[in-house]
Amino acid sequence: MKEYFKVLTIAGADSGGGAGVNADIKAVSACGGYAASAITAVTVQNTLGVKAVHDIPTEIISGQIKAVLDDIGADSVKIGMLSKKETVLTVASTLRNYGIKNIVLDPVMVSTSGHSLLLPDAVETLKKGLFPIVRIITPNIPEAEMLLGEKISDQKEMETFAEKLSLIAGNSVLLKAGHFSDNILSDVLYNAETKQISRYDNPKITTKNTHGTGCSLSSSLAAFLAKGLSLECAVENAENYLQNALREGSDYKIGSGHGPVKHFWRF
């Protein structure tokens, strides 16, 4: 019998379909994997922004994770929006029982539209409770600044701050450059396992359709890790996947605000 490489995504649901679990399932599927999910929150949102957030009870979150892992299993896990401290602790304690190596954490703190998606008291819990069991985190610049308590002013500083954040987090870091305005954006990987730095250069694509880019990158990364690729190769494949999804989706119009990327650009 054939087997899929399997990814469990633990994140919030997006009623607009562009980010969160909705984007994760599309990205993993587009990369050839099988996606299962544990929903941490239901968001009321569209391309114009987040209107409301309803947190799922922690026992239901834990139950979803156990139901998937006890039966289907997972070759990797992607973690996104966790919203509050209790959710962080629940996800960490539940996953700790399964010993999964490939855990990708996208430390979602603020939505594309500027809505807070992680309460301030949950940030320290994220560092202490979840970072120790994660293989790689994928912060953007504002998220890295919140985790470090320092300002990152330009791309030249990214290698230094990626390594600094890795020392704090105790795992590898993919620091994303998308918030800068340069023509070439260079995401930086600090591999904590090899102490090596890699840069991934991408031309900036001018488009409003950027909703869910962080979710799509981290979930495609989880898919390629589940497939058995090395960290560097998995990041390179995920970067290429997202760049194509951004470019191919740049001319589409969905809604009146920030539209999604084209997850199934290969088809």
Predicted regions and their residues:
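N-terminal basic/disordered segments at the start of proteins
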Residues: G17-G33
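Short pre-catalytic strand/loop immediately N-terminal to key active-site residues, enriched for Gly-Thr
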Residues: I10-G16, Q196-H211
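Charged C-terminal helix
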Residues: Y4, D55, E232-F267
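Phosphate-handling active-site elements
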Residues: C31-A36, I197, F224-A238
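Short, small-residue alpha-helix embedded
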Residues: E145-M146, T207-L231
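Conserved phosphate/ATP/ADP-binding segment of small-molecule kinases
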Residues: P120-Q196
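Conserved N-terminal subdomain of the carbohydrate kinase-like
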Residues: K2-T9, S29-T112, F264-F267
